[in-house]
Amino acid sequence: MKKVLFAVGCAGLFLGSAAFADEAAKPYVGYWAVNLNGGAGWMGIEQADCGALSGSILWGGGSPLKYEKVNVENGALVLTRTLTSKKDGKEEKKTEKITAKADSGQLAMTKVVVEQDGKETGKSEYKGNKIKPLPAKPDLAKVKFGEPIKLFEKGLDGWVAMNPKAFNGWSMKDGILSNRVLDENGKNKHGTNLRTVATTFEDFNLKTEACMAKGGNSGIYLRGIYEIQMADTFGKGVDCHNMGALYGRVTPLVAAEKAAGEWQTVDITLCDRHVTVILNGKKIIDNQPAVGVTGGAITCDEFVPGPIYLQGDHTNVDYRNMVLTPIIK
């Protein structure tokens, strides 16, 4: 007989099943770093007090996707969500199914699409590992800093294109790092991202100024894995995809952005997997946990040093006065 724990609402679980629910789900609850065979992924599984499960997965880019059903079946974690598309004018629904098996903190994951006739297609396999629990929120008043590093002091000599085959719209003039990827008709040339030559940054404070183009979209990746969104979102409400957000993870407390074309001050602190962001003098993220990498990360490993990288494949953007001050541990 199959033993199945379904992620239903708490009201749908009997008290007698709670102990089994906790035991069956225990190996999976928490955060997982997922290697997407060259890309950086993440999975988060949470369990309510009643035992009900919920889960989301980051598939390399964008934001984590929430799954409609999460259950444990014969010791394996199963997540499903409905995929809706149109074919010949008719709505067609398929099911994306993820099956994962945990063993001593390691994860073997299989992804398939279940067609309407029940046939499984598009099989892919991935590996992952359990992420260490988040440390306590750091007391930033007690943090010690080293000597500041002016990241633009050597011009472009301190930076390298991340995709040498892509269009490179980055240039440096009068201390301003500019990215120009739109032609005279506004068409995107699909430029390259840019990163520091140095890849040894750990925890730090990063200060810079950014000037967003109308409708602009860029990002500052801390250690190459956590994106602080840079975007023209002036006049919009707070959202985890707007200016200053930890992309797809943490929504700003207030909307503090300026209009496109204005220089904006950005002050970011990354310490013990917690992020603080001060935008234009207003604290919009206050020492909040980074529970996992964000879309576009260069690795799913949150415990290795990395570079600062700037997103350059979307729109035009300017940066100036970028200074990184390392935290001394």
Segments (PLM) and residue ranges:
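Carbohydrate-interacting regions of secretory-pathway proteins
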Residues: 22-329
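Bacterial N-terminal signal peptides
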Residues: 7-16
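Positively charged n-region of N-terminal signal peptides that target proteins for export
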Residues: 1-4
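Sec/Tat signal peptide C-region and signal peptidase I cleavage site
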Residues: 17-21
